[in-house]
Amino acid sequence: MKLSYAITVKDEFLEIQRLLQKLLTLKQPQDEIVVLYDSKNGSIGVESYLRKMNVETTQFLWYPYEFDGHFANLKNELTKHCSGDYIFQIDADEYPHETLMDNIHEILETNDVDVILVPRVNTVEGLTQQHIEKWGWKVNEEGWVNFPDPQWRIYKNSESIRWENKVHEKLVGYDTISNLPWMEELSLYHPKDIERQEKQNEYYDTLV
């Protein structure tokens, strides 16, 4: 079985380096890494890094895409470039727990489902009680925001399965769905600081 790690990136210069280094180290030999770069809004630094890394390692594919403000369109374009039996979509500012990477093939081979929801550990440096109340968030003792925050991320590479919604996108066209256990070891990590969180919220508000 072949798995496609499918990544979207805009201006997350440090984060895309962290993610690619982890994936290149931990992925199975038959798996592929596919990166879709927002060439309309992205940074020169990210594009230069992708070009440089692609020449040096040749272990991932990357493609430019002029983002039109519609996240489902972005992810459907990303899917077109994937050749794996399953796709694991990851944003550039996220990264998977090593245990999840070590076990993902076994999980997929023993669970014949179209879509698997993945838990996510969100942390926001600088988060205050005022922010929590303003956004209606729940934060546990570990400081994780809205855990398990299930994400639509692992799905069969099938023509019938597609993304929809301009923001808060989700998958449609599947027959069966399941979720990973709500455990840190099987989660995506999503760390950010409060400044980036506020900018992201403002940006999403312009798209709704």
Where are these regions (language model features)?
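N-proximal low-complexity "stem/linker" segments adjacent to membrane-targeting elements
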Residues: 1-25
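Conserved acidic residues
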Residues: 3, 31, 60, 85, ...
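Chalcogenol-based redox active-site neighborhoods
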Residues: 68
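Acidic donor-binding segment of Leloir-type glycosyltransferases
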Residues: 20-64
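Catalytic-site signature of metal-activated, phosphate-bearing donor transferases
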Residues: 71-79, 86, 95-208
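Solvent-exposed polar/charged
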Residues: 25, 80-81
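A short acidic, amphipathic alpha-helical/loop segment
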Residues: 18-22, 49, 77, 102-104
